Amino acid sequence: MAELRAHRIAEQMKKELGEILSRKIKDPRVGFVTVTDVEVTGDLQQAKVYISVLGDEKKKQDTLLGLSKAKGFIRSEIGNRIRLRKTPEITFEFDEALEQGNRIETILRDLNK
């Protein structure tokens, strides 16, 4: 039962984070960010947000720095939008799955040539 609730909250957070990052964050370091997944622990105390960023490695690091500086604001916005007793602590991580998928697709395409 707790896993179902955690999954529902993760999906709601993913939706709200997408809107917050696109409309509310004014930091120039935060460029085009896509929230690919959110994992919330069963006790709803921590949330791991997976993001994808367009750009080179420097742009990715700048975006992560900007998001870490805005973490308090983002958490308060989530708290205002989703009614929870305690808003989960947010950590941002890069989603490497997209890059790995592209790399595998390139390898498979080269094999077929």
Curated annotation (Swiss-Prot):
Monomer. Binds 30S ribosomal subunits, but not 50S ribosomal subunits or 70S ribosomes. This is Ribosome-binding factor A. GO terms for cellular component: cytosol. It holds the Pfam family RBFA. It comes from Oceanobacillus iheyensis (strain DSM 14371 / CIP 107618 / JCM 11309 / KCTC 3954 / HTE831). InterPro entries: KH_dom-like_a/b (IPR015946), RbfA (IPR000238), RbfA_dom_sf (IPR023799), Ribosome-bd_factorA_CS (IPR020053). One of several proteins that assist in the late maturation steps of the functional core of the 30S ribosomal subunit. Associates with free 30S ribosomal subunits (but not with 30S subunits that are part of 70S ribosomes or polysomes). Required for efficient processing of 16S rRNA. May interact with the 5'-terminal helix region of 16S rRNA. It is found in: Cytoplasm. PROSITE patterns: RBFA (PS01319). GO terms for biological process: maturation of SSU-rRNA. Belongs to the RbfA family. SUPFAM superfamilies: Ribosome-binding factor A, RbfA. Transmembrane segments: none annotated. GO terms for molecular function: ribosomal small subunit binding. Keywords: Cytoplasm, Ribosome biogenesis.
